[in-house]
Curated annotation (Swiss-Prot):
This is 5'-AMP-activated protein kinase catalytic subunit alpha-2. Coiled coil: none annotated. Residues 38-49 have a biased composition (Basic residues). It comes from Caenorhabditis elegans. The modification Phosphothreonine is found at T243. The gene is aak-2.
C-alpha cells in the first residue's frame, strides 16, 4: 500500500544540505509491516468516526428531552458560539504547527468555509512570518478551479484568520490509502487537474515547492484543490533558489543536495512522484532511513511495474529525470499523448494572442481597488508597460484577466464563451485607459500622473490627454473600418499586431518625415472597446528606442455616427461607431469632425507636432463617422 513516512516528519525537517547531516531513523521495514500500519491507520480513523457519531447521537438525544431545557440549552450553545467577522466557527477540521483549521458558517448565506487560525505568537517564535505572508499574498490573488480559494483575511491582536474555500472530500493521500492504486482513467483525471493548477502557478511566477498528496484536497465531486502555499516562492528571471523545501519523499535531487534550482523543475519532479503514487499506490522513492532515501532519490532509479503502459513509463522517466536540464517541463507534460487523452477544455483555455493584446480596463480598475495596493490606474499602466514582468501590479492584473477566462470546472465551454465577462455592477463610467506600447516600439514608458500622491518628478509633468473612439462592435469589425479609413485617406501604416498599428501621412517630399501616431484597441468593459489615438512625436524626438516620454493625446466621449461605405461579403453588417469630443482645457477643436483633409500650411511653414497629430485624428474620425 501507499507508505508515506514524511507525513509525520515533514514539519520537523526543512531540509538543506546533504542527507547524511539529518538524523537517521530506523532501517527499512518489511512491506508486511507497512500494510499493518496502513490497516491500523484505517481502523483508528474508523474508531474516531464511530466515537464522533456516538457523541453526536448523545447530543441529539439531550436536545430532544422534554420540558423547557431544550430551548435553554440551545440558547446557551448560541451564546457559546465564537464569531469572527461574518463567520460562526464550528468543529475543528485539523490541527497544524501554527494553529487550527475550523469549519466556519457564513451567518447570512449559511455557506461553509474553512477558517485557518494562525497564532501570532507561534508564528513569531517559529520565525515563519515570511512563509505565512507568501501564502496569503499568493492565495489572495489565485483564482483557479483547482487551487484552494482565499476569500478574506481577518487580523486580531492575537491571531490571523484566513477564510478559505471549504472542501469536504479530504486529502488525496487518504483517498489513495483507501483505494490503493487507481484506474488509469481516474489517475489521469486527477493528474490533469493537478498539472492545470501547477501550470497556472508557474505562468504567474509562483512555484509551490511542497506538492504532495497531503496538500491536494478533494471536493465533494472528487475534484482536486491545491492547498498550502506556505513554502511557495516568487520566481525571478536569473535568480536561483537554494532553500530545501517540502517533504523528502517528493523532493527533487537538487533540493535535497542543497544545489541551486530555478523553481518550476522541482514542482515537475513532485508531480512525477504524485503520478507514480496515483498509478501504483506506492512511492517511487521510499525508505525509513533518511540517508538511504536520499541516495535512492539522487540515483533516480525506481521500479516500474509491468501493469504500467509504455507511454506512462516514458512520461514518468522524463519527469523523474535526475538532471533538471533534461527533465520534462510543464509544457512537455501537457503535450504528452497520454496526458492529452480525455483532456477537458476548461483546464487549458486557449489564449488568443490578438485578444490578449487588448488591455482590459475593468481588470486595471479591479487592481486599483485592492486595499493593500492603494494605487492609481496610471501606476498599474506603468507596471504593464514596464520591463519587469514580475511586478506585483502586473501579476495582479494578469491573474484577474485569467480569472475571467477560466470557466467553471464542471462546464465545457467554447473558446468564445471564455471571453464573456459579467461585470459585478454593469459597465461603469469610462476612466482614462492604460496605454500599452508593443516592445518593438517602446521598451518602457513613464506615464505622467495626475494624482497628488505621485512622485515629485512626475508631479511636474503636464497632464495627459487621451483621444479615442468607443464602439460596441466586434474588435475585428472596428479594425476593418480603421484600415478602410486609412486607405481612403491615403495614409501609410505598419501593423504591430491585428489591434495595434503605427500610422502617418504619406510624405510630401522624399526628405519629409511626417509625425507618426499609434492606434491601439482596448477593451473597456464587457460590451465595448476603445480605439486609442496616441502621438509618437515625443518618442521620435527622443531616441530610436523611445524608452519614455510625455505624449499628447486627449479624451473623447462620443456621439453616435453611422459608418457608410462598401464592405466585402465576408464581413458582418456595418457597425455602429460612437465618436465625439469632450470639453477641452486648452483649445476648442469643435471643427475637428470636418469631412475633408486639412490643406497644407500656407507658406510651407511646419505645423507643430501636436497640431499635426490633432489634424490626423480629425481626418480619421471624420472619415470613420461618414
Amino acid at each position: 500500500m501507499f507508505s508515506h513516512q514524511d507525513r509525520d516528519r515533514d514539519r520537523k525537517e526543512d531540509g538543506g544540505g546533504d542527507g547524511t547531516e539529518m538524523k537517521s531513523k530506523s532501517r527499512s521495514q518489511p512491506s508486511g509491516l507497512n500494510r499493518v500500519k496502513n490497516l491500523s491507520r484505517k481502523l483508528s480513523a474508523k474508531s474516531r468516526k464511530e466515537r464522533k457519531d456516538r457523541d453526536s447521537t448523545d447530543n441529539s438525544s439531550k436536545m430532544s428531552s422534554p420540558g423547557g431545557e431544550t430551548s435553554t440549552k440551545q440558547q446557551q450553545e448560541l451564546k457559546a458560539q465564537i464569531k469572527i467577522g461574518h463567520y460562526i466557527l464550528k468543529e475543528t477540521l485539523g490541527v497544524g504547527t501554527f494553529g487550527k483549521v475550523k469549519v466556519g458558517i457564513h451567518e447570512t448565506t449559511q455557506y461553509k468555509v474553512a477558517v485557518k487560525i494562525l497564532n501570532r505568537q507561534k508564528i513569531k517564535s517559529l520565525d515563519v512570518v515570511g512563509k505565512i505572508r507568501r501564502e496569503i499574498q499568493n492565495l489572495s490573488l489565485f483564482r483557479h478551479p483547482h487551487i484552494i480559494r482565499l476569500y478574506q483575511v481577518i487580523s486580531t491582536p492575537s491571531d490571523i484568520f484566513m477564510i478559505m474555500e471549504h472542501v469536504s472530500g479530504g486529502e488525496l493521500f487518504d483517498y489513495i490509502v483507501k483505494h490503493g492504486r487507481l484506474k488509469t482513467a481516474e489517475a489521469r483525471r486527477f493528474f490533469q487537474q493537478i498539472i492545470s493548477g501547477v501550470d497556472y502557478c508557474h505562468r504567474h511566477m509562483v512555484v509551490h515547492r511542497d506538492l504532495k498528496p497531503e496538500n491536494l484536497l478533494l471536493d465533494e465531486q472528487n475534484n482536486v484543490k491545491i492547498a498550502d502555499f506556505g513554502l511557495s516562492n516568487i520566481m525571478t528571471d536569473g535568480d536561483f533558489l537554494r532553500t530545501s523545501c517540502g517533504s523528502p519523499n517528493y523532493a527533487a535531487p537538487e533540493v535535497i543536495s542543497g544545489k541551486l534550482y530555478a523553481g518550476p523543475e522541482v514542482d515537475v519532479w513532485s508531480c512525477g512522484v504524485i503520478l507514480y503514487a496515483l498509478l501504483c499506490g506506492t512511492l517511487p522513492f521510499d525508505d525509513e532511513h533518511v540517508p538511504s532515501l536520499f541516495r535512492k532519490i539522487k540515483s533516480g532509479v525506481f521500479p516500474t511495474p509491468d501493469f504500467l503502459e509504455r507511454p506512462i513509463v516514458n512520461l514518468l522517466h522524463h519527469m523523474l529525470c535526475v538532471d533538471p536540464m533534461k527533465r520534462a517541463t510543464i509544457k512537455d507534460v501537457i503535450a504528452h499523448e497520454w496526458f492529452q487523452k480525455d483532456l477537458p477544455n476548461y483546464l487549458f483555455p486557449p489564449i488568443n494572442e490578438s485578444e490578449a493584446s487588448i488591455v482590459d480596463i475593468e481588470a486595471v480598475r479591479e487592481v486599483t481597488e485592492f486595499q493593500r495596493y492603494h494605487v492609481a490606474e496610471e501606476e498599474v499602466t506603468s507596471a504593464l508597460l514596464g520591463d519587469d514582468p514580475h511586478h506585483h501590479l502586473s501579476i495582479a492584473y494578469n491573474l484577474i484577466v485569467d480569472n475571467k477566462r477560466i470557466a467553471d470546472e464542471t462546464a465545457k465551454l467554447s473558446i468564445e464563451e471564455f471571453y464573456q465577462v459579467t461585470p459585478n455592477k454593469g459597465p461603469g463610467p469610462v476612466h482614462r485607459h492604460p496605454e500599452r506600447i508593443a516592445a518593438s516600439v517602446s521598451s518602457k514608458i513613464t506615464p505622467t500622473l495626475d494624482n497628488t500622491e505621485a512622485s515629485g518628478a512626475n508631479r511636474n509633468k503636464r497632464a495627459k490627454w487621451h483621444l479615442g473612439i468607443r464602439s460596441q462592435s466586434r474588435p475585428e469589425d472596428i479594425m476593418f473600418e480603421v484600415f478602410r479609413a486609412m486607405k481612403q485617406l491615403d495614409m501609410e501604416w505598419k501593423v504591430l499586431n491585428p489591434y495595434h498599428v503605427i500610422v502617418r501621412r504619406k510624405p510630401d517630399a522624399p526628405a519629409a518625415d511626417p509625425p507618426k501616431m499609434s492606434l491601439q484597441l482596448y477593451q473597456v468593459d464587457q460590451r465595448s472597446y476603445l480605439l486609442d489615438f496616441k502621438s509618437l512625436a515625443d518618442e521620435e524626438s527622443g531616441s530610436a528606442s523611445a524608452s519614455s516620454s510625455r505624449h499628447a493625446s486627449m479624451s473623447m466621449p462620443q456621439k453616435p455616427a453611422g459608418i457608410r461605405g462598401t464592405r466585402t461579403s465576408s464581413m458582418p453588417q456595418a457597425m455602429s461607431m460612437e465618436a465625439s469630443i469632450e470639453k477641452m482645457e486648452v483649445h476648442d477643436f469643435s471643427d475637428m469632425s470636418c469631412d475633408v483633409t486639412p490643406p497644407p500650411s500656407p507658406g510651407g511653414a511646419k505645423l507643430s507636432q501636436t497640431m499635426q497629430f490633432f489634424e490626423i485624428c480629425a481626418a480619421l474620425i471624420g472619415t470613420l463617422a461618414r
